[in-house]
Amino acid sequence: GEAPAPHDARIDAAVGRGLRFLARTQEPNGAWVAIIGRKVLRSYEGTPGHHVGVTALACLAFMAGGSTPGRGPYGRNVERGLEFVLASTLENGFISAHNSRMYSHAFAALFLAEVHGTTRDSRVREALQKAVGLIVSAQNAQGGWRYLPGVPDSDVCVTVCQVQALRAARNAGIYVPKDSIDRAIEYVRKSWDPRTGGFFYQLPQSRLSFQLTAAGLTALYGAGYYEGPEIDAGLRFLVREWPIYYRAPQTFDYYYGHYYGIQAAFQRGGSFFSEWHRRIAGELLELQRPDGAWSDYVGVNYATAMATLILQIPYQYLPVFER
């Protein structure tokens, strides 16, 4: 792949402030607090609690800067976060705390996959194998996933998280059935709308949006599908939609959309990516608070983990974010 992006002093300083904020807000049990709930219309409802998905994202943000469990400036934070994630792994492989659902499970599995290569801890491999088994068995007849295991319908947003976790696990040497990935690609490709170039939330046709399209493209790239009409048209859709949709006030989807948006742009590479990165970095630097955090409905820890991940993806410390 191409060399990692050169470091930019302003971005590095913003990331440093964000990571220091996260290091301060970690709970004694290793978790981070965020709202555990679900999106309702344009808002997000639930109750604050120790959030296993946000804990995984915060740890991934530290790892995206080069820390691993017990090593690097935030090694201790990653280690404590890992203990919380392992403690939240249920007997059937579902990683859940306080009724968190498949999104959180996927981010936790992704984190375990990225940690797997950095540690000899056999608990990590065991939890990751079980977590992958749960993802594979929760895939439904459509080829996708929904909020909970065993639900008959699926949506693109939950699906991309699972595909990315499966890809990271496979890269880490865990067996993932090829059929599972193939069916996911088929489901995501069926969700594409040739008329607009965007991706639908659910089939049959529902809403289209920036974040769904970013998620759809990232799922296809993650599953090894790099060429096709969906890719070019999807990227054009993102460029067209961004200025319309993506400014403050931040909806719940802002950070989620840009987490996948930058990955889609990164896979395309070249000037498309460098222009994209410059633009989202400018936006995020404007939105950062004086205390180093970013904020949104799910909470400051979620937004800060996502923002610092988005800014660090080009540095390619994490295998899942390599081209």
Question: Which residues fall in each region the model found?
Answer:
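An alpha-helical repeat/solenoid feature that recognizes helix-turn-helix modules
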Residues: 1-20, 33-77, 90-133, 137-183, ...
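Active-site-surrounding "flap" and adjacent substrate/cofactor-binding loops of secreted or lumenal enzymes
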Residues: 75, 82-84
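Alpha-helical segment of the N-proximal tetratricopeptide repeat
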Residues: 21-25
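Predominantly the C-terminal beta-signal and adjacent terminal strand-loop region
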Residues: 285-289, 295
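Acidic, divalent-cation-chelating loop motifs in proteins
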Residues: 26, 89, 192, 288
